[in-house]
Amino acid sequence: MRTLQEMTLQEKLGQRLAAGFQGLEPPEEFLRLIKEYKVGNIILFRRNIQDGPQLKKLCATLRKVVEEETGVTPFITIDQEGGVVTRLPESEVNIPGAMAVAATGNPRNAYDMGLLTAQELRSCGVDFNLAPVMDINCNPDNPVIGVRSYGDTPERVAEYGSQMVRGLLDGGVYCSLKHFPGHGDTAVDSHLGLPCIDRSFDELMQRELKPFIAGIEAGAPAVMTTHILFPQIEPEHIPATMSRRIMTGLLREKLGFGGIIISDCMEMDAIKKFYGTVNGVLAAMKAGVDLVFVSQTPALAAEAMQNARRAAENGELDLAELDVSVQRMLEAKAQCAAMQPKTLGDEAACRARAEEVRAASITAVHLPRGGMPALGDNPLFLGCADYRSTIASNGESSGFTFPEEMRRHADKGTALVTDKDPGDAEIAEVVSQAAAHSCIVLGTYNGHILQGQLRLAKALAATGLPMILVALRNPYDLRNMPNHVAALAGWEYTRPLFDALWPVLNGTARPTGKLPLLTLTKAAK
């Protein structure tokens, strides 16, 4: 691998950028980015992946091109958090998400899911997982974190997140804590706006920073920034990613973090809309971010590289700091390449372990006095199709629906797919249809945000029919339901979850999960 002393200015700058592309094969525009601008790192999404063998071949091709053009192996990164944020297709083993794992009540499960994920990624050629989420989801109205967090207390997030870190590292994959210094207490998605968390340093130390400190102590080699304003820490109107006070002053100097600092995508609206991606990339580099992500648009990545080159040549970007950052990247890549991975077992063992944890995560937030209602002879399964509730999720629809999958399992009753935000006319029609059924099984997907789903739930509950309500993402949908409604947290809208849920619905299994939240008004009974 090329040393710092052997690198040109452009090669050094290229080590500090990660870029992405559309499609299953890298287009010429993306390959030019590597050849002309020496971009040395890659991010992959679901849009780039067909199956495991294709991903392995793609990673090998990309690694070869980057090594030939830059003399340094790339970090190939991916957001494989589990649950609602997974990039691997169903053909591979996908783990439950953070809050689901915490609902099992066993931190060892977080370690095993990290180890399993690392094994899956390494087998495909990916060496850097952009996980775990260390945000504390203390705001039920948070539109982007929710079930991606391990819970709403710093202690639980620290404990489970640190175990995930240890599992990923033992499995031979780099990982990053995100989103520093915290994205949990906001009602704005930084993909779409510019959130603000108005907390002092002491307040952050008491809550938001505790999981990050624990993750660093567990050995996390990287920390990802967040595009959020923290006005009591950074008085200038710039988000954490672009703030030297936060990146260098807080993370490096006060917390003593010596690993690599990476940015969230600089094409998110919190940066692109308010500051511009190109200017934001340079500001992040100057703030102390080692690896900056331009994940969607190769042309923007090229423009950002040109701008950074000009800044380095005119003295705006400090060359000594550039060298320190690049050396840190080179050492991180050498460390990653030298990892000696452990494994959890063969693919069948990994799949069985993920299914075991997923089944253990299903949580009864409330059960009627008589327990789970019986489905009867003619159950009604209903709910919306999944949709892209945040840009952090995959762009493609799953192609299956909760009602249809449950109807397939039951082999009886009716499946009814509703709108994601049903209006009064649709609600009235659904309630009318429900009257002929023995039991209502409604799956919601962020109904606490799209209120039509909750209006539908309450209208169906008012019929007095036996009813099971399943939250298929954030469990806040389950608040304030009548006592005769069984309320289950399923945590994700995936086929493996539906398979695990079916024995609970048909009465052959009990929901054993424990609610990892204090912010729900109904306690698990």
Regions found by a protein language model. Give the residues of each.
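A charged helix-plus-loop insertion that forms the helical arch/lid used to bind
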Residues: E92-G105, S149-G151
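Short, conserved phosphate-binding/catalytic loop or strand-edge motifs used
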Residues: M134-V144
